[in-house]
């Protein structure tokens, strides 16, 4: 199945009822989840980091892209990639991360507003949701 077909399948999943998208941490768990009948997979930043003996947020974009490519190659399911905070402070950094993920075979992805440079904080009611942040590739 081509990446374009996987992306179309992933997009179609979003048009129907909510679905569960599990997080494989390696190629073996991706195959098990595929065999269990899930319709798509999503990378897990913390799960992948832990397989490397690191904390969440301590994995480079290059490592995430290599991990994404390995998962996309081992399964016929669409793979959505966790791109952390976009791997840089600028919108161009996020655009580069998305382009690299697409080139690695990702069918979708997510970018969170997260900052690993300081201690963990709690969110309060002042956080809003911005519109128009959806992208597909």
What are the residue ranges of the model-derived segments?
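N-terminal amphipathic alpha-helix/helix-capping segment at the start of soluble metabolic enzymes
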Residues: 1-23, 27-35
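Conserved, mostly hydrophobic/aromatic
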Residues: 26, 33, 71, 82, ...
